[in-house]
Amino acid sequence: MIQSFTRLSVADNSGAKEIMCIKILGGSHRRYARVGDVIVASVKKAIPNGKVKKGQVVKAVVVRTKKEIHRENGSLVRFDDNAAVILDAKKEPIGTRIFGPVSREVRYANFMKIVSLAPEVL
């Protein structure tokens, strides 16, 4: 569960290393974001010569959370970190590679480009 001021690692090669959630999109007073939700975030750590810079405000989709995900078949899935992929204005990923596994819920949220770039979908 991601809320305001939560820091997430970035799971792509856009140049950002860490982002901080500012707002969760999809509702007027939405408190938490889960896997597949789009958030507005600020870049807190970035590498030099990257596509995004420190302090830039970006949109991102959550791909991994420490909080477990309950599936309809009764299974639970949880990850070791909170991670997101930075998006452009067309809701396509800015980076060309995805690092680490992504959750299957990203596919249900219609982010097929992220699913196709991911090395593993859990």
UniProtKB/Swiss-Prot annotation:
Entry's PROSITE patterns? RIBOSOMAL_L14
The record's annotation in InterPro entries points to: Ribosomal_uL14, Ribosomal_uL14_bac-type, Ribosomal_uL14_CS, Ribosomal_uL14_sf
Keywords associated with the record: Ribonucleoprotein, Ribosomal protein, RNA-binding, rRNA-binding
- A GO term (biological process) for this protein? translation
GO molecular function of the protein, one example? large ribosomal subunit rRNA binding
Q: Which GO terms of the cellular component aspect does the record hold?
A: cytosolic large ribosomal subunit
Tell me which HAMAP family the record gives.
Ribosomal_uL14 (MF_01367)
- Family assignment from sequence similarity: Belongs to the universal ribosomal protein uL14 family.
Question: How does this chain assemble?
Answer: Part of the 50S ribosomal subunit. Forms a cluster with proteins L3 and L19. In the 70S ribosome, L14 and L19 interact and together make contacts with the 16S rRNA in bridges B5 and B8.
State the NCBIfam families in the record. Answer: rplN_bact
Q: What is this protein called?
A: Large ribosomal subunit protein uL14
Organism the protein comes from: Helicobacter hepaticus (strain ATCC 51449 / 3B1)
Gene this protein is translated from: rplN
